[in-house]
């Protein structure tokens, strides 16, 4: 099953993969991941390359290169056992392929290894993964609007994602969170996001670490009555994040989304009979006045 699950996910997502490969980030990343394969197998690129094969064929893998590639395959399969989305599967393949390419190029020629590392650094500095721009029902907060919105109507339950655009885990979770917002958003249950990589004071206020080594991104916090009710991942006594998988099933189960949704629907119906002097639940919107998804 550890092997079949990633393969099934990839086959199921072939149409989406074709759209990804049309984007510069994924196209260039795929080329870098296959760089050694192209150099070693395609003439005239392979002509004149050193080889340890007994037949002296420079356009085929020697036994050590095969061992490295087999080890890469094993690592990718083990890492993909914990991957949830196709983006995570592809990201793991790209990352470990580049590591293997670096080793293979340095083993072939130190100059080729240095050139490959330089290309990877330039790629990382100039190309960023495309942000999720699909349908969603999410309100984007900034450092001022998040507290105002949470306090505006305390009958509204909020689920807020604290994210950073540079985090691969946040990028992988984006389509899952968007899909949840489309399924469960209603008058009394709203979904929000705030970029703590951009608004560092928000990360400090809500105790979400933005360190590059952190395991706290993304963080989901449930607010009820304007106060934090729970969060995932949890933080232990030493201030470290407890490992938690951000899958759609886990979010629905841990945050009791089905129950929250039914309760919010009942409250919204009862709200029709609320006297005028009581505050009325705010109308959900996709973005706030001060924040827009495209600004990121």
Swiss-Prot record:
Cell location: Endoplasmic reticulum membrane; Mitochondrion membrane
Subunit relationships: Monomer. Homodimer; disulfide-linked. Occurs in both reduced and oxidized monomeric form. Oxidative conditions increase homodimerization. Interacts with CANX. Interacts with ATP2A2.
The encoding gene: TMX2
This protein's name: Thioredoxin-related transmembrane protein 2
Outcome recorded upon mutating residue 109 to G: In NEDMCMS; uncertain significance
Topological region Extracellular: 49-102
Chain spans, region Disordered: 269-296
One Gene Ontology term of the molecular function aspect: disulfide oxidoreductase activity
């Amino acid at each position: 099953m550890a092997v079949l699950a990633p393969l099934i996910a990839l086959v199921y997502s072939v149409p989406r993969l074709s759209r990804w490969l049309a984007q510069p980030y994924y196209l260039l990343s795929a080329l870098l991941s296959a760089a050694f394969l192209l150099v070693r197998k395609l003439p005239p690129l392979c002509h004149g390359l050193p080889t340890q094969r007994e037949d002296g064929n420079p356009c085929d893998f020697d036994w050590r290169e095969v061992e490295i590639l087999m080890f890469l395959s094993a690592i990718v399969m083990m890492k993909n056992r914990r991957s949830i989305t196709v983006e995570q599967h592809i990201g793991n393949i790209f990352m470990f392929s580049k590591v293997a390419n670096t080793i293979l190029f340095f083993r072939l020629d130190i100059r080729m290894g240095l050139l490959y590392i330089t290309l990877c650094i330039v790629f990382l500095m100039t190309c960023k993964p495309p942000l999720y721009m699909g349908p969603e029902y999410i309100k984007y907060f900034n450092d001022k609007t998040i507290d105002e919105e949470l306090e505006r109507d305390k009958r509204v339950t909020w689920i807020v994602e604290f994210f950073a655009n540079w985090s691969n885990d946040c990028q992988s979770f984006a389509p899952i969170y968007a899909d949840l917002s489309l399924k469960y958003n209603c008058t009394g249950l709203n979904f929000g996001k705030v970029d703590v990589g951009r608004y560092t004071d928000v990360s400090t206020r809500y105790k979400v670490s933005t360190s590059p080594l952190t395991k706290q991104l993304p963080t989901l916090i449930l607010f009820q009555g304007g106060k934090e009710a729970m969060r995932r991942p949890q933080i232990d006594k030493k201030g470290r994040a407890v490992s938690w998988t951000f899958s759609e099933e886990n979010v629905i189960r841990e945050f009791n989304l089905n129950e929250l949704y039914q309760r919010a629907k009942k409250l919204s119906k009862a709200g029709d009979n609320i006297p005028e002097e009581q505050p009325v639940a705010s109308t959900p919107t996709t973005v706030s006045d001060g924040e827009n998804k495209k600004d990121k």
